Amino acid sequence: MESKSYTWFERRRRTKALDLAQEQITKALDTVTLLHQATKKMAENKRKEAMQYIENIFKVEKEVDKLRTEVFKELSKGVALFAEYREDLMHLVKRLDTLADHVKDAARCIKMLGDAEIPKEFWENTAHTTSFLVDCAHALRGSIEKIAVDSVAAIEGAKKVEDIERKIDDEYLKTKALFIKHGREVDSGSMVIFDDLVEFIEHAADMCADTADYIVILASRE
């Protein structure tokens, strides 16, 4: 997984809170890549490999939670940053933590569906959707990096996130349509869980877009 240095943070006085926040944001976005790899492996019927990615998601998400707690602990000391930037940092950390939560919930659904008989088209569509989610996360990562050094680029990156999120909305509807096409081939329990999987991926995309909206606000201040 790649590790980035967010220039917006570099312009502030180096603190433990900023170091922890950078790591938390990076790991939260990394969970999206792991989810895509898991859905790809399910589409290829490589279930054992898919489950390895799922376990990695659970591991990374726990690290994200731990880092969030440590960031808030540092920020509560009151001297980590000026109040305005402390608030900005908390909002970013909360949003990315929620994103990782949605990815974890999607991963749980995949784990439950590990032995279920699911049409290949379901997994192929889902893998296609998560590929867009990876694009969304990469655009979000780039936008965060540009907040301080190039506010125009940061805003453009945020708009790119929203454009990709709309594509995910389209894929969401296509996948839902498969429920009708293959309804008689899938047992009701598996269908309910797959529906949850699709919803959690959509929630993750929505959180990317929500974070992008907040980045526009931050970049406009710079």
Where in this protein do the model-derived segments appear?
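Cytosolic, long alpha-helical scaffolding segments
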Residues: 1-222
